Amino acid sequence: NNSRKTLITNVVRQSEHLNTILNINYSYLNVLAQELSKSQDLFSEDNVSLIQAFMHNTDLNRTAIIDPNGNALYDNEVIKNVAHRRYFKESMQSKQSLSDPLESSVDQQTRVILCVPIFRDRQVIGVVGGSYNVTKLGNMLFDDLFEGQGKSFIVDQGGNLITRNKQYEKKHKLNTVDNLFNVCNQKKIKTDFKNQKSDLVLIQTKKKESLYLAYSPLKINDWMVGYIVPVHAAQESYTFITHYETLLATFLGLIVLSLIVYLAHSSSRENKYLIHLSEIDPLTSVFNKET
């Protein structure tokens, strides 16, 4: 039905939107990488100033320049070695990379590292990366859809939650759920996740509540964007929208009809006036001649 179509359409659009946001941040990093490559010393004071300014003017939280040995110099001038990290290894192979999510023990926010290679004369001379708050990214989803009665999230191919809303989980007693497949263990969902396909399925909770689950691939790291909403909420919302659209169409129809009647009436009055003018015009001519 139409509420199902609305859900699928929205989850696909949101997936495309998030993909665009991440790609914009990759673009920022690529521009920064070009500037960093101009200095013979990757860890020069000018480059440190560059990444500090970059961090303050983008949504990336922590920025680092990484040399070929994996030594990372951060914007706060702390140095760590990340040679063992997948994102570093992939970027050293001329690839853009996105790390696995990490939850901060300080603010419980989930962050990922976006990394791009630094080129000079077509050779990779290092890596530049920045951390991005995916919890914040996830909270941007579906804020106004179905009056906030549903919940959006990002999961990996294995169903592990990447973004989560602690307040929502506490309200609905979902704080122990770490994997989507623990809630809805349908073969179709797992197959669609593996094949990176969009769809919508009906699931039943242990409390016999019917829910719609819509999902679509994010096209980065095999992640999926998901949205779950009670069936009654989706259907009620669509019924309201349909009723509203019917009222609006009726109102516009009445306006058009009134306009047609008005124009017809105006045309009739104008015709009568022209006839009246044609009757007095000869008299006027005669009157003008007599004067």
For each feature predicted by the language model, list its residue ranges.
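Juxtamembrane extracytoplasmic/periplasmic/luminal helical "stalk" adjacent to the first N-terminal
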Residues: 1-42
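Solvent-exposed, extracytoplasmic
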Residues: 43-59, 90, 119, 123, ...
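Extracytoplasmic/periplasmic sensor domains and loops in membrane signaling proteins
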Residues: 48-50, 75-103, 168-202
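Amphipathic coiled-coil signal-relay and dimerization helices
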Residues: 66, 70-77, 160-165, 214-215
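Extracytoplasmic/periplasmic ligand-binding sensor regions of membrane-associated signaling proteins
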Residues: 68-144
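Extracellular/periplasmic juxtamembrane segments that couple receptor/chemosensory ectodomains to their
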Residues: 178-246
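Cytoplasm-proximal transmembrane signaling helix
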Residues: 232-274
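Conserved nucleotide-binding and Mg2+-coordinating catalytic segments in signaling enzymes
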Residues: 274-291
